[in-house]
Amino acid sequence: MESTLGSDLSRLVRVWRALIDQRLKPLELTQTHWVTLYNIHRLPPDQSQIQLAKAIGIEQPSLVRTLDQLEDKGLITRHICANDRRAKRIKLTDDAEPVIKEVTGVISLTRSEILDGISTDEIALLTNLVERLEQNIIHLQNK
């Protein structure tokens, strides 16, 4: 019997993301906005768009639309890098901090609800298995 693990994991990510999007809709944000804000927040200040894209694990052109939206919402600013005029640096605005705090609460509550009834040992085991699968895939890609 063929394993459906890949499809199962893909479906899990899809429904998890859809729930996050649903929960963030009242804040006029999406899971993509959250991942971007979270990474800007956790990285050292004034990251370039290239560095941010690498941290998130996406291509820079894919990031630009999300950054445009966050800039339109007044949550980030972008400015030309003094050392490389082709590069843009990203900075959170003062308005972003309370939004990040509120979204963190929504994400934490949602995660807690999703993981309800699953022990910390089970979560640790699943996390370990996912990391091992990822390492196997990376190894295969580098062959």
Curated annotation (Swiss-Prot):
Pfam families: MarR
Taxonomic superkingdom: Bacteria
Annotated region of DNA binding: 49-72
UniProt entry keywords in alphabetical sequence: Activator, DNA-binding, Repressor, Transcription, Transcription regulation
Domain HTH marR-type: 2-135
Cross-referenced InterPro entries: HTH_MarR-typ, MarR/SlyA-like, Tscrpt_reg_MarR-type_CS, Tscrpt_reg_SlyA, WH-like_DNA-bd_sf, WH_DNA-bd_sf
GO biological process: response to stress
Entry keyword annotation includes Transcription: yes
GO function terms (MF aspect): DNA binding; DNA-binding transcription factor activity
Entry-linked SMART domains: HTH_MARR
UniProt record similarity statement: Belongs to the SlyA family.
Assembly information from the UniProt record: Homodimer.
Function noted in UniProt: Transcription regulator that can specifically activate or repress expression of target genes.
NCBIfam families from the UniProt entry: PRK03573.1
Protein name: Transcriptional regulator SlyA
Organism this protein belongs to: Edwardsiella tarda
Lineage: Bacteria, Pseudomonadati, Pseudomonadota, Gammaproteobacteria, Enterobacterales
Gene name of this polypeptide: slyA
